[in-house]
């Protein structure tokens, strides 16, 4: 009885996400990330490590350019960028196993790579969060409650989306797109500039 009531409550919370998204827009987006970080991890998940590394490097360079000219600026930019990538991985894992879990599960049923990514998105954050409360709850119970909570909330979000005929609560919010575009535009401009073109004789 208590478990059913709790599940209904979590589904109800998820169902309200559509109305909140329609009222407040991107403020309540399920995932808010810099574009380069999202692109980096998406590329790694798709098995494109070179593209993922390029996006991560673009993120670090864009951050480096925004920092004030202080000693060891490049090292600080690399450190902050690394922390940002870890945070991005955590946010995307949460999105994949919570709000977007029906789509993640469907992908996992037809793709071995998607299955591995989903398992990692479930296992790694679960172990990390359980370790902090390991003295008060065993791993099995913690994992079961976490998965049940995420599944109920995510089901509620999709239920609300279909009932409200709006998928605003499912859309991610990507930030810092302009700086990334400017960075790639600069790279492209240098790569295609006449000075870099091979001379013809």
Which sequence ranges carry the predicted segments?
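Structured alpha-helical bundle/scaffold domains in large eukaryotic membrane-trafficking regulators
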Residues: 29, 163, 167-170
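Negatively charged linear elements and acidic catalytic determinants
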Residues: 19, 23-26, 160
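Membrane-penetrating hydrophobic segments
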Residues: 24-35, 46, 94-99
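Actinobacteria-biased recognition of intrinsically disordered, low-complexity terminal regions
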Residues: 167-201
């Amino acid at each position: 009885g208590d478990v059913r009531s709790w599940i209904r409550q979590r589904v109800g919370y998820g169902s309200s996400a559509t109305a909140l998204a329609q009222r407040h827009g991107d403020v309540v987006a399920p995932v808010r990330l810099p574009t380069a970080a999202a692109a980096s991890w998406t590329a790694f998940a798709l098995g494109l490590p070179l593209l993922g590394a390029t996006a991560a490097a673009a993120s670090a360079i864009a951050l480096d350019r925004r920092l004030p000219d202080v000693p060891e600026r490049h090292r600080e930019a690399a450190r902050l960028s690394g922390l940002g990538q870890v945070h991005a991985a955590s946010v995307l894992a949460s999105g994949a196993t919570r709000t977007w879990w029906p789509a993640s599960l469907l992908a996992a049923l037809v793709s071995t790579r998607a299955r591995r990514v989903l398992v990692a998105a479930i296992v790694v954050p679960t172990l990390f969060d359980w370790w902090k409360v390991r003295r008060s709850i065993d791993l099995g119970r913690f994992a079961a409650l976490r998965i049940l909570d995420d599944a109920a909330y995510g089901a509620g979000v999709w239920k609300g989306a279909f009932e409200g005929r709006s998928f605003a609560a499912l859309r991610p919010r990507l930030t810092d797109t302009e700086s990334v575009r400017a960075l790639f535009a600069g790279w492209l401009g240098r790569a295609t500039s006449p000075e870099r073109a091979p001379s013809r004789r």
